[in-house]
Amino acid sequence: MTSGEGANSGADPEGFGSSAIDDAARLDAALPDIDWTVPPPGAAASVFRAPSGDLSMLTIGDPGDTRVVLVPGVTGSKEDFTLMLPGLAAAGYHVQTFDLAGQYESAAAGPHNLRPPRPHYDYDLFVRDLIAVLEAGQAPAHVLGYSFAASVAQLAYAERPELFASLTFLSAPPQPGQAFRGVSRIGRLSWLASGRVGAALMIWGIKCNFVKVSPGRLRFVNIRFASTRFESVRDIIALMKRTPDLRRELAASAIPKLVAVGEHDLWPLRLHSGFAREIGAQLAVYRAGHSPCETSPHQLNRDLLALFSRAG
């Protein structure tokens, strides 16, 4: 399914996304269960010294190629893009992804490392870290922000647009302000939960495997939670209740933009479609939930490569 500014939100049977059955969709339908702790062949692990501390990073591809930076969301990590990395590198891109401060193998990074120290993880911390990553390599780069990280990418773009060749928002909050208000079924009650309560509920739900991920994925998720700092999840949930409104700035931008979502995402498709229309972005929808990078990686790569080609 595709849409752009002024387009309708109906499925396009000739387009891509949930309506398309092609080689990418067939590859995704045959995905095996994997050990998510093992990096894909050719990927190198490293540590990036960011303003908030040491960030754990994976890199794949030729450093001379155009750069792609994939940024995971809350309770996530660089491993969420494991199935995407080889395909993007094979297509001729230098791909980097890193754990956010406080998350998984970047757990030691955080506001306590800033000068002066700060009591909470805030938008400025995550934006400074992302800008530092972008400044440290070839720019402009194609940037994908997953869920909460989409807001971070938007803020970084508003401050340093010259660092961005394109923007992709994967399963991103489609509304500014209290982002959880639009979540299907429970959104109208979300204002009752504090950051601490919201974080605890999110972690509990993921550990209980209500979305029925594979055994290998569930094992990795539990390993990751053992390292992730609860305070980082708590603070990010609180930040998502103050999602910035950058729709005007994004709509005025000439760089290619993509809103990529699963048809069973946390937020209803009509909100994602409206967000894409408001900012002049293409919309791609997959037969997936909140994590197309895990369940539809070949289709997502296909659409990213089409987006990148529009950047020249």
What spans do the regions from the language model cover?
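Gly/Ala-rich beta-loop-alpha elbow adjacent to hydrolase catalytic centers
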Residues: 145-149, 153
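Post-His helix in hydrolase/transferase enzymes
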Residues: 294-308
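Conserved loop-alpha-helix segment in the C-terminal half of the alpha/beta-hydrolase fold
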Residues: 258-294
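An N-terminal hydrophobic leader/cap segment in hydrolases
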Residues: 2-47, 58
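Flexible "cap/lid" loop of the alpha/beta hydrolase fold
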Residues: 154, 158, 164-195
